[in-house]
Amino acid sequence: MKRYLIGASLALSAAIAAGPAFAQATLSQVKARGQLACGSNTGLAGFGVPDDKGNWTGLDVEYCRAIAAAIFDDPTKVKFTPLSAKDRFTALQSGEVDVLVRNTTWTMSRDTQLGLNFGPINYYDGQGFLVRKKLNVSSALELSGASVCVQQGTTTELNLADYFRANKMKYESVVFATSDETVKAYDSGRCDAFTTDASGLYAERLKLTNPADHIVLPEIISKEPLGPAVRHGDDQWFDIVKWVHYAMVGAEEFGVTKANVDQMLKSDNPEIKRLLGAEGKFGETIGLTNDWAYRIIKHIGNYGESFERNVGAGSPLKIARGLNGQWTKGGLQYAIPIR
């Protein structure tokens, strides 16, 4: 027993000693490379899509730019790798990307079986259905016997089966490998309905030949907590990815914006002072400079600003805040205290 305890103690000591060096691996690699490798969508309006000049925009894209701003004080130091639903986890597991921010649903199997950690939920979503108005359908419960276009390898495909089985309805699943293929098939008339996350329905509807001819049905059939993912084994990197989101949400709560962040440096509010690095050394605890959150807000803005310009009232999608509003206004976005 004594020999066992000594051996266990030595093993624990070795693990503790090795821990910090391993924990810094991703951050060190990102700094040495000079840019963040971000896994993004292949093209989803409002979340991750390149414009005509190849510049990436979207809510998820700005999450990655915020990470780069925190590290480099430069939101442009990001390489975006477009990934399909089928390839996204492999790319993260293999080290091709440092972080995956690609409207990905956090589920138990993904969290416990893929060697990944999921960060804060940057968009609370739920699965819905898009149909043609001429189908004269006002509820998903009227879709019995319908053909439904769905993307392969997604929680969407599984939820679709669950919903129709639970409601004792028949349907034909028409499956495609990519989001673009799925949308094009629906637009061409291959299917009666198209299903994905509700945010995606509003985004993809913009791509249709006649967007006004299609409606999103009222039913939300699932919970889709969307957020970033990182590999297991690097707690410091996981902390960085988490706290970037919390900083943006906290900034919105305290009224700190891209426009007033310099003025807010003079605030007497201790929470704002800690957020912006004017008090305490919280940046150092995650391997960053103490003005890491100031950098994020100066370059990107707070969570509300990012939401509004990408998917909210200031965007073509015009999605209401809903569950993604601040906790003080009936939403679920809630910043962990910096103290």
Walk through the language-model features, giving the residues of each.
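Bacterial N-terminal signal peptides that target proteins for export
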Residues: 1-8
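Cleavable N-terminal signal peptides
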Residues: 9-11, 21, 30
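Extracytoplasmic small-molecule ligand-binding "clamshell" domains
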Residues: 23-101, 288, 303, 326, ...
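Sec-exported extracytoplasmic/periplasmic mature domains
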Residues: 31-32, 68-73, 93-97, 134, ...
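Acidic, polar ligand-binding/catalytic clefts
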Residues: 65, 69, 73-142, 199-220, ...
